[in-house]
């Protein structure tokens, strides 16, 4: 089974503030949907709750939500107690790929288990960010493909580039 991280990060590895994204990038969201559709997705409870209610659970995907709260339940998701538990659930499913979609502690716990990442590098810094992608994430990776370069336009406040990278 392929375990893949998909994340958008700022220049200083910023990924969020106050349980929300720091940007609205429709073409990045479109890429996210295209890549994850039909696969399993692993996320922490806060990431799940940050998804607008009308979009959750994410349609046409196995939603695996990690929470240490045994009483936390959501319709349409499979609950996991830990990142390793979430991986076991994904491995025992019929899905051939699992995407790790956040948040920071989930990325941190699973970054050594992945073989590929789709990283959206947002061409901006966000001093008010309070959530960050793991430090040194770029160690032991090779850029395989530059997938998309988006310039600033009426729908995109920030330029960004999406890369496919592989772990060595």
Label every PLM stretch briefly.
Residues 1-168:
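Enzymes that bind and transform nitrogen-containing heteroaromatic metabolites
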């Amino acid at each position: 089974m392929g375990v893949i991280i998909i994340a958008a990060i700022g220049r200083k590895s910023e990924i969020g503030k106050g349980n929300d994204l720091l940007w609205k990038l429709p073409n990045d969201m479109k890429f996210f949907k295209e890549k994850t559709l039909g696969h399993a997705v692993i996320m922490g409870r806060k990431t799940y709750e940050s998804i607008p209610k009308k979009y959750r659970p994410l349609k046409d995907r196995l939603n695996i939500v990690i929470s240490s709260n045994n009483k936390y339940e959501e319709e349409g998701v499979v609950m996991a107690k830990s990142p390793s538990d979430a991986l076991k659930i994904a491995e025992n499913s019929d899905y051939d790929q699992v995407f790790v979609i956040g948040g920071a502690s989930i990325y941190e716990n699973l970054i050594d288990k992945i073989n590929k990442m789709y990283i959206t590098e947002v061409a901006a810094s966000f001093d008010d960010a309070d959530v960050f992608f793991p430090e040194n994430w770029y160690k032991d990776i090779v850029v395989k493909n530059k997938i998309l370069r988006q310039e600033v336009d009426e729908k995109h406040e920030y330029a960004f580039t999406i890369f496919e990278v592989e772990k060595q």
